[in-house]
């Protein structure tokens, strides 16, 4: 067949003697991809399986990163992600890169158990998660992303429709635990990065419609790097970012 084929298999395992919820197995990647295909001057790649996809440019929070679910039992910084089943079609041409994602299965967020640290005052019982969609974790999500560069500016713009990766946490009827509730959302996201010498100027912004409301959130800032400080191999970077979320403090967690 035309083009090149590749496969990836990256398992992950964690055992915790104190917290049973933190003991888990996962496939971070397990996919087959066919790249180098060509159609009417366009370069095409098809990927089928489980993969991790990262979107974003800022450091303090990744607002636009929505494909993969957070593996919260690994770390509070939400950098660790669960593998996401997907079909990904990528089309590259001189006008930019277009990615289409079909996400046929939803991964629930992991939470520490009763004996886990760190956790909320009430433990989260994610075994009893609830969904807005009647399809629950079988709901098929969809995402479309365009990315390109214009001079020194890198741009990413996407639309996502499906199950929100961030659950609302509701107090269970017994009053002793929290239950995750996953809404259906429509989300538009934008990420920009302007590179000039040692400066990086960054912006991430989203508009999300779901849970009977629409809201906008953004994070913007800069990063400056001093290279080879005192003629050494060390670099020093300075970072400043500002976060904004127009939701009120009374919104449910």
Please provide the spans of the model-predicted regions.
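Outer membrane beta-barrel
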Residues: 2-118, 151, 239-241
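Residues on the lipid-exposed face of transmembrane beta-strands in outer-membrane beta-barrel proteins
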Residues: 1, 29-34, 87-91, 144-148, ...
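Residues that define the transmembrane beta-barrel architecture of outer-membrane proteins
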Residues: 1, 23-28, 81-85, 92, ...
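Outer-membrane beta-barrel proteins
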Residues: 18-21, 43, 55-60, 107-113, ...
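Outer-membrane beta-barrel strand-turn architecture
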Residues: 2-3, 36-40, 92-95, 149-152, ...
């Amino acid at each position: 067949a035309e083009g090149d084929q590749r496969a990836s298999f990256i398992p992950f395992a964690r055992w915790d003697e104190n917290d049973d919820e933190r003991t888990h197995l996962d496939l971070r990647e397990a996919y087959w991809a066919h790249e180098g295909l060509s159609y009417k001057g366009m370069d095409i790649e098809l990927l089928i399986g489980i993969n991790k996809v990262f979107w974003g440019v800022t450091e303090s929070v990744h607002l636009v990163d929505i494909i993969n679910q957070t593996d919260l039992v690994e770390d509070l910084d939400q950098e660790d992600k669960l593998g996401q089943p997907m079909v990904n079609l990528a089309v590259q041409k001189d006008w930019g890169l277009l990615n289409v994602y079909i996400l046929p299965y939803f991964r629930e967020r992991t939470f520490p158990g009763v004996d886990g640290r760190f956790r909320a005052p009430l433990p989260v019982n994610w075994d009893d998660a609830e969904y807005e969609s009647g399809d629950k974790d079988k709901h098929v999500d969809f995402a479309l992303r365009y990315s390109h560069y214009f001079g020194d500016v890198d741009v990413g713009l996407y639309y996502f429709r499906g199950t929100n990766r961030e659950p609302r946490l509701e107090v269970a009827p017994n009053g002793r635990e929290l239950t995750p509730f996953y809404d259906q959302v429509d989300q538009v996201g934008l990420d920009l990065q302007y590179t000039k010498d040692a400066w990086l100027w960054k912006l991430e912004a989203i508009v999300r419609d779901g849970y009977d409301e629409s809201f906008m959130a953004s994070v913007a800032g800069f990063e400056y790097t001093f290279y080879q400080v005192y003629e050494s191999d060390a670099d020093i970077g300075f970072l400043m970012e500002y976060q904004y979320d127009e939701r009120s403090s009374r919104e449910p967690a």
